[in-house]
């Protein structure tokens, strides 16, 4: 067996074509760790019905951002940069929860290379059973069926890692540089929403998000800021306020310059490229907000890659 260590980057994934939108949505809505729709035996059938109805609308969103999600290419670029940062002795792989390359694909590639030591690194900074939890459980399921023995370690959160906070603050500063007077700017941290029931059941996601915001603001200093939640889906109670509600409230208060800071996303995909850049930008204009911008995503930011490398080395005992 190879003495190298495999680092598996766990990410949500996204459709790589318009034709892939409906099957991607089916994979998402079939996952009972993220959403429970009826009895377990019926969920695939209900998910199929929901996806057929939702797909045309979602396909139109993807048409506006180039006909696919860029998340695979961006995550593979992160993997390549991480491999370079870590140096000899490491190989980085990508495992997408709801599309390709799948967890099975990643483990098959690791097996072909004869690697037995695996570090699974969730690219969700803030732990939730619906995101990092689901990806790790999928990895464990596949490992149980792999027919080969891997020595596996897991990294399931890094919401307060100093280099993550520094990288995020750096991107906010980049966004602020587009405004002539930062004292006039309102920051809106926009995190992916989650059903309130998850938090009520003890999921730490909200507390992790709040900690990240607090730590970033400690670096940025005295700037007006707010936290809101985007990407709701379905009739259940979600975390509040929604990003749209927050924008309306701030516009009513006379705020004219706004910088949106995506949280819980470490690379660009539909939540940043469509929801923020197109949908929220249009709403901002309708609300009378004169200047609306988004801070750049982390993607392969050198500081962020350094953060991931430190996380890996801390597990390996090299930190």
From Swiss-Prot:
<dbReference type="GO" id="GO:0005737">
    <property type="term" value="C:cytoplasm"/>
</dbReference>
<dbReference type="InterPro" id="IPR033659">
    <property type="entry name" value="Ferrochelatase_N"/>
</dbReference>
<keyword id="KW-0479">Metal-binding</keyword>
<keyword id="KW-0456">Lyase</keyword>
<feature type="binding site">
    <location>
        <position position="271"/>
    </location>
    <ligand>
        <name>Fe cation</name>
    </ligand>
</feature>
<keyword id="KW-0408">Iron</keyword>
<feature type="binding site">
    <location>
        <position position="192"/>
    </location>
    <ligand>
        <name>Fe cation</name>
    </ligand>
</feature>
<keyword id="KW-0963">Cytoplasm</keyword>
<dbReference type="GO" id="GO:0004325">
    <property type="term" value="F:ferrochelatase activity"/>
</dbReference>
<protein>
    <recommendedName>
        <fullName>Ferrochelatase</fullName>
        <ecNumber>4.98.1.1</ecNumber>
    </recommendedName>
</protein>
<dbReference type="GO" id="GO:0046872">
    <property type="term" value="F:metal ion binding"/>
</dbReference>
<dbReference type="Pfam" id="PF00762">
    <property type="entry name" value="Ferrochelatase"/>
</dbReference>
<dbReference type="InterPro" id="IPR001015">
    <property type="entry name" value="Ferrochelatase"/>
</dbReference>
<comment type="similarity">
    <text>Belongs to the ferrochelatase family.</text>
</comment>
<keyword id="KW-0350">Heme biosynthesis</keyword>
<comment type="function">
    <text>Catalyzes the ferrous insertion into protoporphyrin IX.</text>
</comment>
<dbReference type="InterPro" id="IPR019772">
    <property type="entry name" value="Ferrochelatase_AS"/>
</dbReference>
<dbReference type="InterPro" id="IPR033644">
    <property type="entry name" value="Ferrochelatase_C"/>
</dbReference>
<comment type="pathway">
    <text>Porphyrin-containing compound metabolism; protoheme biosynthesis; protoheme from protoporphyrin-IX: step 1/1.</text>
</comment>
<keyword id="KW-0627">Porphyrin biosynthesis</keyword>
<dbReference type="GO" id="GO:0006783">
    <property type="term" value="P:heme biosynthetic process"/>
</dbReference>
């Amino acid at each position: 067996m190879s003495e190298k260590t495999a680092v598996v980057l766990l990410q949500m994934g996204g459709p790589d074509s318009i034709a892939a939108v409906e099957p991607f949505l089916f994979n998402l809505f079939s996952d009972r760790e993220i959403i429970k729709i009826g009895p377990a035996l019926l969920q695939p059938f209900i998910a199929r019905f929901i996806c057929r109805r939702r797909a045309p609308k979602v396909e139109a969103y993807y048409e506006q951002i180039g006909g696919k999600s860029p998340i695979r290419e961006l995550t593979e670029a992160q993997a390549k940069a991480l491999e370079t940062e870590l140096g000899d002795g490491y190989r980085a792989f990508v495992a997408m929860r709801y599309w390709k390359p799948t967890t099975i694909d990643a483990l098959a590639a690791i097996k072909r290379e004869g690697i037995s030591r695996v570090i699974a690194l969730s690219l969700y900074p803030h732990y939730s059973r619906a995101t990092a939890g689901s990806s790790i459980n999928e990895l464990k399921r596949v490992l149980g069926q792999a027919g080969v023995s891997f020595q596996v370690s897991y990294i399931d959160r890094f919401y307060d890692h100093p280099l993550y906070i520094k990288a995020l603050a750096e991107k906010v500063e980049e966004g602020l540089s587009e405004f002539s007077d930062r004292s006039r700017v309102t920051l809106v941290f926009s995190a992916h929403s989650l059903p309130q029931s998850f938090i009520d059941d003890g999921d730490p996601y909200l507390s992790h998000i709040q900690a990240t915001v607090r730590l970033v603001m400690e670096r940025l200093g005295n700037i007006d800021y707010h936290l809101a939640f985007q990407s709701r889906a379905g009739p259940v109670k979600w975390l509040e306020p929604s990003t749209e509600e927050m924008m309306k409230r701030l516009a009513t208060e006379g705020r004219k310059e706004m910088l949106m800071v995506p949280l819980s996303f470490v690379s660009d995909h539909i939540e940043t490229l469509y929801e923020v850049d197109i949908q929220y930008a249009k709403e901002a204009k309708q609300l009378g907000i004169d200047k609306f911008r988004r801070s750049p995503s982390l993607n392969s930011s050198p500081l962020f890659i350094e953060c991931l490398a430190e996380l890996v080395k801390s597990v390996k005992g090299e930190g």
